[in-house]
Amino acid sequence: MGYVERRVAVLDRRRLGFRVMVFVHVKLVRGARNSVAEFEEQVRAFPEVLECHMLMGETDFLLKVVTQDVEGYEQFLRNKLSIIPSVQEVQSSMALASVKCTTELPLAGLGARDDG
């Protein structure tokens, strides 16, 4: 496969009505068999979750979630995320503004690196 994974249109989430963006730290129950795989499978099915990253540190995963409003996020939290059996703790931080949001990789100078 080449360098291009896929071609997409970048949509304006606010114009489409998704005014709330939340970054969610999730800690899973320790020692639960298959907890990571089950969590990942369920999160992949949630359309509200734009990104899911496994972390090293205090929490296990970081999710980027969008909803139309705060009530929509509350419903997502209560009816989807919090009922996953392996979820032990959730910490939510609502974004007030996006200072930089890009999908561009820093390609300038990529081949000019000196490994010597």
Where are each of the predicted segments found?
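A compositional/biophysical signature of low hydrophobicity enriched in polar/charged and small residues
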Residues: 1-116
